Design a protein with these regions (language model features):
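Compositionally biased, intrinsically disordered low-complexity segments enriched in Pro/Arg/Gln/His
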Residues: 36-39
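Glycan-recognition and catalytic cores of secretory/periplasmic carbohydrate-active enzymes
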Residues: 1-21, 34, 44, 50-54, ...
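Compositionally biased intrinsically disordered regions enriched in polar/charged residues
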Residues: 23-25
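N-terminal secretory signal peptides that target proteins for export/translocation
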Residues: 28-29, 41-49
Length: 562
């Protein structure tokens, strides 16, 4: 039974005994303060307390007594130290000054950061063993899947490894990029997906490392994607053959999705800035200008499809912040930030769209009064929300941080609670792909899920927004919510041989139904945002210096002279 592959050896990560003992130190010190050190009863109680925890407790007891006599010993700050870390020498009795012991919150932070590193290593072990150089790992069947045949998972994960300080894994992946990665292939790629994952990943890794290998590869793939823009309307084709230099729409339609053609701008603009070749930015800026002028919007909201021949919106009357439209709104704000807040049309479109969301798409559940973003279909609100929409709290918070209206942050807080509940109200603690909200029955559940929508693809949008919310508020509840999600990933999606798998039913903790696929964005986005959420270091990819593309690849905010 494939589902049983997820059960063994996949517990919620426990606190190591030494960490548990260390976190008891404040109570033990109070006992010493309130009672004579030589009191037999107190010593007996302490010895018993440590004995029942673990043998490690005896070591902590010795440290505790030593600290009482004046020598400060720094507690070990991690559940699994990085291989490059060096243990400090024990202080001599004469060296009485030193750092204060870590408080419980700091211990919690270290534990969580190390848990993300361990999760990445486990996922990478599966990819390295069963799918090396291929696009995606199929962890249950211990094989791989191909989409473009370009090592998507490896490229998507490069900057994550750098940020997590996994230098050994990074160097091995870099060698593959240097010796094996070639874009001279007769293969069709999706313009949007290859831009955000491959071009974005290479540009980000170049900026983090300074290694021109990644910039050279970025130039190569960027130039090969340019035939997509050879259309009558300048709205790009969805697919490009990077070997032949040809492009075409999907086989079933002449339309492209609005999100796909308006969520490639950060990457191509940055490529022009680095190469001093204006063709890339010129192509994507023309798309932005044309969409800015188009008829068919509703209070700043855009339809989901656009025709590559006419350059006009199609399937009008349906408006969503979910699939096919989501990152259009995200990139309005982020392009404005990337360019130094100088492009007024981008800000105008973004602010108008947020007002459109508030006027047309917001609903409230009957039981718990959760605020959600629904879909507008020909004037009627549908209480349906994709997990993808959970990018919005983070985007709203980012805008508010950069001087946009304070009520954007108020809405972000409300929507963040709703996205949290999409996880918390499921039996596995993991969100489904799509939910329906209860508007009528106050005695019912806030959230319902159709059987076809109960899958979880290891998506990043909620933990992405948790990262932004914590960075800007320092409210630890957002870290706690992220930790709950991390634990649920470990419990229900972790495969013992290596990797994590999408699951088919978040409502069934007994048989969640492994789907045997680890999307590249689990390493490129989900684990990266979890690590940044738990890191507590605002300078680790500073949001005042970088803007993340929609695949979580940080690109620099341009200097004022750009």
């Amino acid at each position: 039974d494939p589902s049983q592959l997820l059960r063994p050896n996949a517990p919620i990560l426990p606190k190591p005994p030494a960490l548990v003992c260390t976190m008891m130190l404040p109570d033990i010190l109070i006992c010493f303060l309130l009672n004579p050190v030589g009191s037999p009863s107190v010593l007996a109680e302490l010895l018993f307390m440590f004995h029942i925890v673990s043998v490690s407790g005896w070591l902590i007891l010795c440290l505790c007594v030593l600290s009482w006599r004046g020598a400060m010993i720094e507690a070990e700050q991690g559940t699994e130290p990085h291989p490059s870390a060096h243990r400090k020498e024990t202080a001599r009795p004469a060296e009485l000054q030193g750092p204060a012991p870590l408080q419980p919150v700091a211990f919690k932070r270290v534990e969580r950061v190390e848990a993300v590193r361990e999760a990445f290593r486990h996922a990478w072990k599966g990819y390295r063993t069963f799918a090396w150089g291929h696009d995606e790992l199929k962890p249950v069947s211990k094989t791989y899947g191909e989409w473009f045949g370009l090592g998507l998972t490896l490229i998507d994960a490069l900057d994550t490894m750098w940020i997590l300080d996994l230098k050994e894994e990074f160097e091995e992946a870099k060698r593959w990029v240097e010796t094996e990665l070639s874009f001279s292939k007769n293969v069709d790629v999706n313009l949007f997906e290859s831009t955000i994952r491959i071009l974005g990943g290479l540009l980000s890794t170049y900026h983090l490392t300074g290694d021109t290998l990644f910039l050279d590869k970025a130039k190569d793939i960027g130039s090969r994607l340019m035939p997509a823009f050879n259309t009558p309307s300048k709205i790009p084709f969805s697919d490009v053959n990077i070997g032949k230099g040809t492009a075409h729409p999907p086989r079933w339609t002449a339309d492209s999705t609005v999100a796909e053609v308006t969520s490639i701008q950060l990457e191509f603009r940055e490529l022009s800035r680095l190469t001093q070749d204006p063709q890339y930015q010129k192509a994507v800026d023309e798309v932005t200008r044309r969409v800015h002028r188009l008829d068919g919007k509703h209070d700043g909201l855009v339809p989901m499809f656009i025709n590559i021949n006419s350059g006009k919106f199609t399937h009008r009357g349906v408006f969503t912040l979910g699939a096919r439209a989501d990152s259009y709104y995200e990139y309005l704000l982020k392009q404005w930030l990337q360019g130094g807040k100088k492009e007024a049309a981008l800000l105008e479109d973004y602010l108008q769209a947020v007002e459109g969301v508030k006027r047309n798409l917001l609903g409230q559940t009957s039981p718990s009064k959760l605020i959600f973003v629904g879909e507008l279909s020909h004037g009627r609100l549908n209480p349906k929300m994709d997990h993808l929409v959970c990018f919005l709290p983070g985007t709203l918070a980012l805008g508010a941080h950069n001087g946009l209206p304070a009520d954007h942050m108020e809405l972000a807080v409300q929507l963040m609670e709703t996205c949290h509940q999409m996880y918390a109200q499921m039996e596995t603690g993991l969100s489904p792909e799509i939910v329906l909200f209860n508007l009528k029955d106050p005695a019912g559940r806030d959230i319902d899920v159709k059987p076809a929508d109960r899958h979880n693809l290891l998506r990043p949008e909620t933990v992405e927004s948790l990262f932004y919310m914590y960075r800007f508020t320092q409210d630890h509840k957002y870290q706690d919510w992220g930790w709950e999600i991390m634990q649920s990933f470990n419990k229900y999606t972790r495969v013992p041989s290596g990797g994590y798998t999408s699951i088919g039913n978040v409502r069934d903790p007994v048989n969640p139904g492994p789907k045997d696929k680890m999307e590249s964005f689990f390493l490129g986005e989900t684990l990266k945002y979890l690590f940044l959420l738990f890191s507590d270091d605002p300078e680790l990819v500073s949001l005042d210096k970088f803007v993340f593309n929609t695949e979580a690849h940080p690109l620099p905010i341009w200097p004022s002279t750009s």
